[in-house]
From Swiss-Prot:
PROSITE patterns: RIBOSOMAL_S8 (PS00053)
GO biological process, any: translation
Organism this protein belongs to: Mycoplasma mycoides subsp. mycoides SC (strain CCUG 32753 / NCTC 10114 / PG1)
Superkingdom, taxonomy of origin: Bacteria
Gene: rpsH
Keywords: Ribonucleoprotein, Ribosomal protein, RNA-binding, rRNA-binding
GO-annotated molecular function: rRNA binding; structural constituent of ribosome
InterPro entries: Ribosomal_uS8, Ribosomal_uS8_CS, Ribosomal_uS8_sf
Role according to the record: One of the primary rRNA binding proteins, it binds directly to 16S rRNA central domain where it helps coordinate assembly of the platform of the 30S subunit.
Stated name of the protein: Small ribosomal subunit protein uS8
Family: Belongs to the universal ribosomal protein uS8 family.
């Protein structure tokens, strides 16, 4: 059992993306559902569904444009041993706005851009480009 569930989710997506798989299954949690929702809103994945009653899993449908991957890279920023926090005006941009940062704020999990607009800082979870 892994202790960093977000890193596990990102690693599963990265591995499936490298193999050009259509779907990837991830054990479900509220945080993972919010990250999947953000990935769908930003156009990085096609869709996601939740299956199962007792042991729920999130099935994420990855997106490709021909043989080109839509998700070029994923990076976990805040780790269990080293948490990374940023104020609203210090939230980093990813590749000058080509990617997104995912931030856990007091108002919920959101992209770095939405967190800046809401003037909410928090823990920087991941970069996706």
């Amino acid at each position: 059992m892994t202790t960093d569930v977000i890193a596990d989710m990102l690693t599963r997506i990265r591995n499936a993306n490298q193999r050009y798989l259509k779907t990837v299954s991830v054990p479900s949690s509220k945080v993972k559902l919010e990250i999947a929702r953000i990935l769908k809103e930003e156009g990085f994945i096609s869709n996601f569904t939740v299956e199962g009653d007792v042991k729920k899993t999130i099935n994420i449908e990855l997106k490709y444009q021909g043989k080109t991957r839509v998700i070029q890279g994923l990076k976990k920023i805040s780790k269990p041993g080293l948490r990374v926090y940023a104020q609203a005006n210090e939230i980093p941009q990813v590749l000058n706005g080509l990617g997104i940062s995912i931030v856990s704020t007091s108002q919920g999990i959101m992209t770095g851009k939405k967190a800046r607009l809401a003037n909410a800082g928090g823990e920087v979870l991941a970069f996706i480009w």
